[in-house]
Amino acid sequence: MRVLLTSFAHHTHYYGLVPLAWALLAAGHEVRVASQPALTDTITGSGLAAVPVGTDHLIHEYRVRMAGEPRPNHPAIAFDEARPEPLDWDHALGIEAILAPYFHLLANNDSMVDDLVDFARSWQPDLVLWEPTTYAGAVAAQVTGAAHARVLWGPDVMGSARRKFVALRDRQPPEHREDPTAEWLTWTLDRYGASFEEELLTGQFTIDPTPPSLRLDTGLPTVGMRYVPYNGTSVVPDWLSEPPARPRVCLTLGVSAREVLGGDGVSQGDILEALADLDIELVATLDASQRAEIRNYPKHTRFTDFVPMHALLPSCSAIIHHGGAGTYATAVINAVPQVMLAELWDAPVKARAVAEQGAGFFLPPAELTPQAVRDAVVRILDDPSVATAAHRLREETFGDPTPAGIVPELERLAAQHRRPPADARH
């Protein structure tokens, strides 16, 4: 069959598609990957055939223009699972009102959607697999009649939030049932003579790489898949060939700690200083500008701009990180206890779930201090039950099939869900 994968142009969102794309290719299927031009080199660098569509999104420019305003990586975007209070209509509608223009009009801009639909009409895929915010993939499938599914990169906060939003919406008086996302997709589909269906937001089915005990109960048809890490093109450093002489701890926050942690004064330097007296080997992923701020740190510290997590983490006793999808999932499959400094997007959901399983610690902004980070690391190193829980999660993860293992199920589901093109269904 022909399989079209699509992600908006953000490399970490794309990375989660790569192992599945290769599994399909190795099984003999034709595979194409479509995204805005900015991702073309990343796609071809992963060994897959790229289809540039539309113009590059303006998300980064939008962030600058909207500085200080709520946006999807702003604490105002708190999904129900990460909030102590129940989700109400005003909050749910507020989330939708922010997400609709941010992801739906920018990440899936009109030129991208138009070009993707044109390519799908020409190439006629049997199955479209889309990154969970790249709704252009669902639109292209709806127009051409291809089966389609989301490929998640973490707990299904979008599917869960959508289900709860729809339930709250339907309780409102008819004149107050606003739905910005459905309205946008309805207008978009009108251009191609197709109509909106709720499954355009959740897929006809969902491929979920989250371990079952960490999964959200969305009630949606789901295919479990073992997470396989992909870090892009990378080189394994020589020093990883030798086992560490003392417990190895990784510190990686992805971007500057002040940005990730909301500028509350807890910096990477503060954290390093709190760990300075521990007998550990610390591997800290900091660039040159970040290192310049560091004054006091553990004696056995290795600074590096980048190291592939799948190569580093098997040798680690703990990891301190911000809850990024790839870092979290790679820690899970390597049974590494996690200290998660989680605030944004789905990170609190993941961190709370890991902590509830006993496989790590969740430090939300209100509880985050350098001493709290140090205490969590010491607990992990001193309490073997944390490592035991992390190993339990790893074993659970290995109970799911690999990307190659789900290919027969994808073949079956594609045949089940394929339909005639939209213009032939009316």
From Swiss-Prot:
Recorded GO MF terms: hexosyltransferase activity; UDP-glycosyltransferase activity
Please list the GO biological process terms of this entry. antibiotic biosynthetic process
Keywords tagged on the record: Antibiotic biosynthesis, Glycosyltransferase, Transferase
Q: Which reaction does it catalyse?
A: 10-deoxymethynolide + dTDP-alpha-D-desosamine = 10-deoxymethymycin + dTDP + H(+)
Q: Where are the transmembrane segments?
A: none
Which InterPro entries does its entry note? EryCIII-like_C, EryCIII-like_N, Glycosyl_450act, Glycosyltransferase_28, UDP_glucos_trans
| Entry's EC annotation | 2.4.1.277
Q: In which pathway does it act?
A: Antibiotic biosynthesis
Q: Null-mutant phenotype, please?
A: Cells lacking this gene are not able to produce glycosylated macrolides.
Record PANTHER family: STEROL 3-BETA-GLUCOSYLTRANSFERASE, STEROL 3-BETA-GLUCOSYLTRANSFERASE UGT80A2
Something else known: DesVIII assists the folding of the DesVII polypeptide. However, unlike chaperones, it remains bound to DesVII during catalysis, forming a tight DesVII/DesVIII complex. Although the formation of the DesVII/DesVIII complex is essential for the catalytic activity, DesVIII is unlikely to be involved in catalysis directly.
Q: What does this protein do?
A: Involved in the biosynthesis of the macrolide antibiotics methymycin, neomethymycin, narbomycin, and pikromycin. Catalyzes the attachment of dTDP-D-desosamine onto 12- and 14-membered macrolactone rings 10-deoxymethynolide and narbonolide to produce 10-deoxymethymycin (YC-17) and narbomycin. DesVII is unique among glycosyltransferases in that it requires an additional protein component, DesVIII, for its activity. DesVII can recognize and process not only cyclic substrates of different ring size, but also a variety of linear substrates albeit with reduced, but measurable activities.
* Membership in a protein family: Belongs to the glycosyltransferase 28 family.
How does the annotation summarize its subunit structure?
A: Forms a complex with DesVIII.
What is the recorded name of this protein? 10-deoxymethynolide desosaminyltransferase
- Give the originating organism: Streptomyces venezuelae
Q: What is the lineage of its organism?
A: Bacteria, Bacillati, Actinomycetota, Actinomycetes, Kitasatosporales
